[in-house]
From Swiss-Prot:
Residues involved in Zn(2+) binding: C30, C214, H239, E243
Chain's gene name: cysS
Protein name in UniProt: Cysteine--tRNA ligase
UniProt motif 'HIGH' region: location: 32-42
Bound cofactor: record note: Binds 1 zinc ion per subunit.
GO biological process, one term: cysteinyl-tRNA aminoacylation
Length: 465
């Protein structure tokens, strides 16, 4: 099997993946700020790095996968105050909702899922190190800030120079900062902060800045120098750039070897975002589409490419996934183990080892489905299920997928018992040689989105289309 190659944002190129410790991978992914339901952009991040950790394990690595939860942040505080509830009540509620969404999408839980509020002492310890090393200072307003000009390599991840940032970036003015580009490490408490929003420190009561949270959790749980750090493309700057500055400023060593970023989700060629009002929650999508269809919609696009969200693309994903399940419908897979020397498995592995190239890997699944349709071969059916399983797909009994009702069918379509009753009426019509009535029932069912397949021996199977 070829070596895994990953596009490293830091190097701006694909690189052969070499872990720091042979056979082991330590990976940190920036998780979700829990003040609302997860949206499609979150779904993409969750699925992408679920695929990455699944593949790393499939090729034999022992993986420690950490994905954090941001449970203290200005948006969280504002929402809790608006709702008249405690911060913990709000965050616990949306963490539970996030876990429900993840389960629906087939996301395997990370090995460690730290909450920011569990690591306040470690954050303060890192801030004190930065102060000792000359990178941090307490401003007149009580905030502790990071002095970006003290870090010689600032901008190495994003490719942004400090001079360009000063000229072109929108930086919030703050007279207390030594430089407008400096960012906050510790926010001094405000008089109207609600309970649970601040902690005691040598700098006074306050709370951590967003960037220090991930630096402290990553270094504490995975060590000061680890293999992979991932997140959405929108986090590359300033969040991940600031993480590097903090972590390397505190420890004096390389923070992360490989940086991976998934692309944006777009609607009509614009980035999906709350500010534009064009975003959809996972729950809203799952009211209309099966969760595996949503996962497949994400999987079949390369993780670094833009993902264009539309009903047309989701409908196409549903039709494509239906083709894969249909190929397995009447073939019982054999029980042999996956053999990476099999040609389809080799092509699948080559694709996944080429920067997690899921479009090519999915194409291999359709090659297998086509051959199964021609040959009804049990070993090919087994390969299809095994390889798709590595992507978190095709885990259900085919008829369970093909006969399920989602979206419009669920809201106003025929229930399974109604369909079976009409099939029975059609069988009776055929037995009475009333073929016109039998054809009418078939057409009526097709109009309702139900396709019939007459099998040898007189039985009839159905599926939703």
């Amino acid at each position: 099997m070829e070596s895994l190659r990953i596009y490293n944002t830091l190097a701006r190129d694909k690189q052969v993946f070499v872990p720091r410790q042979s056979g082991e991978v330590r990976m940190y992914v920036c998780g979700i700020t829990v003040y609302d339901y997860c949206h499609v952009g979150h779904a993409r991040m969750l699925v992408v790095f679920d695929l990455v950790q699944r593949w790393l394990r499939a090729i034999g690595y022992r993986v420690t996968y950490v994905r954090n939860i941001t449970d203290i942040e200005d948006k969280i505080i504002r929402r809790a105050v608006e709702n008249g509830e405690t911060i913990k009540s709000l965050t616990d509620r949306f963490i539970g909702a996030m876990h429900e969404d993840e389960a629906a999408l087939g996301i395997q839980r990370p090995d460690l899922e730290p909450r920011a509020t569990q690591f306040i002492p470690q954050m303060l310890g890192m801030i004190e190190k930065l102060e000792t090393n000359g990178y941090a200072y307490q401003a007149a307003d009580g905030d502790v800030n990071y002095s970006v000009r003290k870090f010689a390599n600032y901008g190495k991840l994003s490719g942004k120079s400090l001079d360009d940032l000063r000229a072109g970036e929108r930086v919030a003015a703050n007279d207390a900062k030594e430089d407008p580009l400096d960012f906050v490490l510790w926010k001094r408490a405000k008089a109207d902060d609600p309970p649970g929003a601040t902690w005691a420190s040598k700098y006074g009561m306050g709370r951590p800045g967003w960037h220090i949270e991930c630096s402290a959790m990553g270094c504490t749980l995975l060590g000061e120098h680890f293999d992979i750090h991932g997140g959405g493309q929108d986090l590359q700057f300033p969040h991940h750039e600031n993480e590097i500055a903090q972590s390397e400023g505190a420890t004096g060593q390389t923070f992360v070897n490989y940086w991976m970023h998934n692309g944006f989700v777009q609607v009509d060629n614009e980035k999906m975002s709350k500010s534009l009002g064009n975003f959809f929650t996972i729950r809203e999508v799952l009211e209309r589409y099966d969760a595996e269809v949503m996962r497949f919609f994400i999987v079949r696009t390369h993780y670094r490419s833009p993902l264009n969200y539309s009903d047309v693309h989701l409908d196409d994903a549903r039709a494509s996934l239906t083709r894969l399940y249909t190929a397995l419908k009447d073939v019982e897979p054999d029980a042999l183990a996956l053999d990476w020397n099999e040609p389809h498995a080799q092509r699948f592995a080559a694709a996944m080892n080429d920067d997690i190239n899921t479009p090519v890997a999915v194409a291999t699944l359709f090659e297998l489905a086509g051959e199964i349709n021609r040959t009804r071969d049990a070993s090919l059916a087994r390969q299809l299920k095994q390889l798709a399983g590595l992507l978190g797909l095709l885990g259900r009994e085919p008829r369970a997928f093909l006969q399920q009702a989602t979206g419009a069918a669920q809201a106003g379509g025929l229930a399974a018992d109604e369909i079976e009753a009409k099939i029975a009426a059609r069988v009776a019509a055929k037995q009475a040689k009333d073929y016109a009535e039998a054809d009418r029932i078939r057409a009526e069912l097709l109009d309702a989105g139900i396709a019939l397949e007459d099998k040898p021996g007189g039985s009839t199977e159905w599926r939703r289309v």
